[in-house]
Design a protein with these regions (language model features):
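Glycosyltransferase catalytic domains, chiefly GT-A lineage
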Residues: 1-135
Length: 135
């Protein structure tokens, strides 16, 4: 990452997204997902939204924290074996350092209720997963 932010800047709870590459469909999915989270958020202070991306300019003016990722970082996160989904685990590892509670959100997630409710289900002994996927 090219930007370092401490926990007090992000806040106690965050939704964390990872977006990279040039496929417009993923960028549009991320925007729709973020908009759905913002639409259903009842209290502004309940959580923040953090996006790690190599396309920070696509989110200029959005009410989220955008952390710019370099090609070098994305390459390191992919690892020597070239496994692109390893980047997700690396983003989560980096992201959990930014807030008290972090929930990683895939770009194709759409919220129909206040995402703040999810943080009540996350504890030191309890994690949250929407769907286990093998890929």
């Amino acid at each position: 990452m090219t930007q370092h932010i401490n926990r007090s800047v992000i806040g106690p709870h965050q939704l964390l997204y990872l977006l990279y590459g040039d496929k417009e469909v993923y960028r549009l999915e991320a925007k729709f997902s973020i908009l759905s989270a913002l639409r259903h958020r009842k209290n502004l202070a309940d959580f923040t939204i953090t996006l790690m991306t190599d396309q920070p300019e696509a989110f200029d003016g959005w009410p989220i924290t955008v952390l710019s990722l370099s090609e070098e970082t994305l390459g390191i996160w992919q690892g020597a074996g070239g496994y692109s989904h390893r980047r997700k685990a690396c983003a989560i590892q980096a992201g959990v350092m930014l807030a008290g509670k972090t929930i990683f959100i895939d770009t194709d997630t759409v919220f129909f209720k206040d995402p703040a409710l999810l943080f009540q289900r996350v504890t030191d002994d309890q994690f949250l997963m929407d769907e286990f996927e093998l890929s």
